[in-house]
Amino acid sequence: MGLSHSKTHLRVIKVAPLQNKEVETPSAGRVDFAFNQNLEEKTSYSLARLQDQNKALEGQLPPLQENWYGRYSTASRDMYFDIPLEHRETSIIKRHPPQRLQKLEPIDLPRVITSGRLLSQREARTMHKAKQVLEKKMQTPMYTSENRQYLHKMQVLEMIRKRQEAQMELKKSLHGEARINKQSPRDHKAKKTLQSTPRNDDHDLLTMLPDEILNRGPGNSKNTEFLKHQAVNNYCPWKIGKMETWLHEQEAQGQLLWDSSSSDSDEQGKDEKKPRALVRTRTERIPLFDEFFDQE
């Protein structure tokens, strides 16, 4: 970076003529050099000069600027030098100097290692490695023996568990077979009893009794015997059908016991009102499976 530098100079072209010829424009070749140290005189002079220029340029168009790209303009122009009042350095590098290189030193300096010390360190390292290898060799058989014992223990526990499961399955199968064997004779006995009992299609059995049976006179002992016999038969529902068939057969043949009775009893029965025939209904009770075996 150098102090000398080139600046582009601007050319001012006047466009409109002056309206008042008497007013003289300020000389273009006049150059102000502000070398006075007194700041007040400099500012007052610049303000008075600017006022004179404004009065002279009233009614004119603003000037056009043209770049000549490094060529000097023919007309002279005002120049102003920025001269600092204080005496100081103008160089940017001197104003902002770069940082100085700092020397970094380690805190712990390495010790000087001799050849004898290096050999002793190597020997100690090899001895330590050999000791570690020997310890590993001593630990490996102990570790394998522990593993072997653990595996053997797990195998024994697995065998015991399988044996217990097999015993439980065997017990379950034996219990099932015993139940089947107990139920088979019961089923056989039940089938025999069902086959031995007569089968009636209708569950409700109607017992039609003749009118003469209902005449419970004091002298009619035969009727009481028949009623007793009928009450006994009520406990055996499968015998009611046979009794009815026998009564119907006897009626058809006319050989009933009460037909051979005296004529006096017949006349008394005719005089009295004949009661309505009694119809008894009884549902057939089928014995259950458990009750059949409980009776034994």
From Swiss-Prot:
UniProtKB keywords: Cell membrane, Cytoplasmic vesicle, Lipoprotein, Membrane, Myristate
UniProt keyword Cell membrane present: yes
Task: Show the ranges annotated as biased composition (Basic and acidic residues).
Answer: 173-187, 267-281
Output the lineage of the source organism: Eukaryota, Metazoa, Chordata, Craniata, Vertebrata
Report the protein name in the record. Answer: Factor associated with metabolism and energy
Keyword check for Cell membrane: yes
What do the Gene Ontology cellular component annotations say?
Answer: cytoplasmic vesicle; plasma membrane
Please provide the Gene Ontology terms (biological process) for this protein.
energy homeostasis
Q: Where in the cell is it found?
A: Cell membrane; Cytoplasmic vesicle
Q: Where is this region: Disordered?
A: 173-204, 256-281
Sum up the protein's function in the record's words: May be involved in tuning the metabolism, energy expenditure, and excretion processes.
* Matches recorded under Pfam families: DUF4619
Q: Which gene encodes it?
A: CCDC198
